[in-house]
Curated annotation (Swiss-Prot):
Its EC number is 2.1.1.225. This is tRNA:m(4)X modification enzyme TRM13. Zn(2+) binds at C46, H52, H62, C66. It catalyses: cytidine(4) in tRNA(Pro) + S-adenosyl-L-methionine = 2'-O-methylcytidine(4) in tRNA(Pro) + S-adenosyl-L-homocysteine + H(+); cytidine(4) in tRNA(Gly)(GCC) + S-adenosyl-L-methionine = 2'-O-methylcytidine(4) in tRNA(Gly)(GCC) + S-adenosyl-L-homocysteine + H(+); adenosine(4) in tRNA(His) + S-adenosyl-L-methionine = 2'-O-methyladenosine(4) in tRNA(His) + S-adenosyl-L-homocysteine + H(+). Its main location: cytoplasm. The lineage of its organism: Eukaryota, Fungi, Dikarya, Ascomycota, Saccharomycotina. The gene is TRM13. A zinc finger (CHHC U11-48K-type) spans 43-70. It is found in: Cytoplasm; Nucleus, Nucleolus.
Length: 420
């Protein structure tokens, strides 16, 4: 496999040069099966997901069982593309898209936009490295501590913002198996055992899990078991949905959880999912008619290199335009520069000077890494600008929640009524 620079692990027939998945790449550029017994058969990309292929004669059967087959959605909170745009054009600005970059090739785009990034300076963020005693046992048990340190700091900051309470319902976006929520629950139980929370109403406690993927080893049952094993009599409501955030009607999802207050959390919410999460909150009643039900938001952001220009908040696009990034093509180059922040010089790299000279930017590793962090900060600041422009009465800020040697994706976004 040229793209991955390794051999395919699948087995092939003796009469064929390629396995069934890669037979479409045979030397004749034909997708006809070379097996003489199946000479009239043909390997074709799956219409539902072109990443895999299927024998044409089996296509009808395959389409009935393909994992990419669209599922008919019946959940009341499913609303197709509800968060692609803001409701009632909230925060919309005039279309600032320009076609001025269409005629430029990639090298010219780098030449145009690298000087802009070099001219931008930000004050360093504040470090808010916190911890929670409820995760001390986990830190003592695990050999590789980077995830536990991040979880402990995030939960410590949730507590510092006065959001770690069984009066709240925690909604984890991009939850995966909901490991962060499980440790939020353990830390909350630890606080209750130490009688840190004196005034609590346990009937409002719960969790909502949102993820578009299929996840194994989910923590839902472990959260309930942790509560059963605790001396504290508490049983949280738990509701999980497999859904893309762009299709989530948040008001209808949280309605069944019967929350007193909602706290939105996530650890490493990837790329456009962060912007869609912000849109889902802005499209809900939590930041308008039911502000008293919004406790706060605390998410660790990551992967700005897979953000989408179309999914940015309108005010984010406005901010980027003011900084010189006015077009989708300019944003595409900005995203590529963002990747330099987490793909710096590798210790084992050979022929470093030649690799640097051949790079399209003509920059060395250290320069690319430095500019990558500026580019990443620019996207983050656009989100903060948008939220501050659209929300009144809320604290909006970013901070570093762990050191860079724990994770390079160490920026946390906070929105709440309590200052931090």
């Amino acid at each position: 496999m040229i793209k991955k620079n390794r051999r395919c692990a699948m087995r092939r027939k003796g009469s064929q040069k390629y396995c069934s998945e890669h037979i479409i790449y045979n030397e004749s550029s034909s997708i006809v099966n070379t097996d003489t017994k199946l000479s009239e058969d043909e390997r074709v990309p799956c219409p539902l997901d072109g990443k895999h292929t299927v024998w044409k004669k089996n296509l009808a059967v395959h389409l009935k069982k393909c994992n990419a087959k669209p599922v008919e959605r019946t959940e009341e909170w499913f609303s197709k593309d509800i968060n692609v745009k803001l409701k009632n054009s909230l925060g919309e600005t005039e279309d600032i898209t320009r076609s001025e970059d269409k005629t430029l090739d990639e090298k010219d785009l780098y030449s145009k936009y690298i000087p802009i990034i070099e001219g931008i300076n930000f004050e360093p963020l504040q470090y808010r490295i916190s911890e929670h005693s409820g995760l001390q046992q986990r830190l003592n048990e695990v050999l590789i501590q980077k995830h536990a340190l991040q979880q402990s700091s995030l939960i410590g900051n949730i507590k510092d913002a006065k959001l770690l309470s069984p009066n709240n319902t925690f909604v984890e976006f991009g939850c995966g198996k909901a490991e962060l929520s499980r440790f939020v629950n353990l830390c909350l139980l630890d606080d209750l055992k130490q009688k840190v929370n004196n005034e609590v109403t346990l009937e409002n406690y719960g969790y909502g899990f949102i993820d578009r993927g299929v996840n194994r080893m989910k923590m839902d049952k472990k959260i309930l078991k942790d509560c059963l094993d605790s001396p504290i009599e508490i049983t949280p409501r738990i509701q999980r949905t497999r859904i893309d955030i762009k299709d989530l009607d948040l008001d209808k999802f949280i309605n069944k959880l019967q929350p007193s207050k909602i706290v939105a959390i996530s650890k490493h919410l990837c790329g456009a999912a962060t912007d869609l999460t912000l849109k889902s909150l802005l499209n809900s009643s939590l930041l308008s008619d039911n502000r008293d039900k919004f406790g706060g938001l605390l998410i660790a952001m990551c992967c700005r290199h897979v953000c989408s220009y179309d999914q940015l908040l309108p005010k984010s696009r406005e901010y980027l335009a003011e900084k010189g990034f006015k077009t989708p093509d300019s944003f595409r180059i900005l995203k590529k520069m963002v990747s330099w922040a987490v793909c710096s010089k590798k210790e084992h790299a050979k022929n470093v000077e030649r690799l640097e000279a051949e790079h399209i930017s003509q920059l060395d590793y250290s320069s690319r890494e430095r500019l990558g962090f500026v580019a990443r900060r620019l996207i983050d600041e656009s989100r903060v600008y948008a939220l501050k422009s659209m929300l009144s009465g809320f604290e909006v800020k970013m901070f570093w929640y762990v050191e860079k040697d724990v994770t390079l994706e160490n920026v946390c976004l906070y929105v709440g009524q309590e200052p931090m």
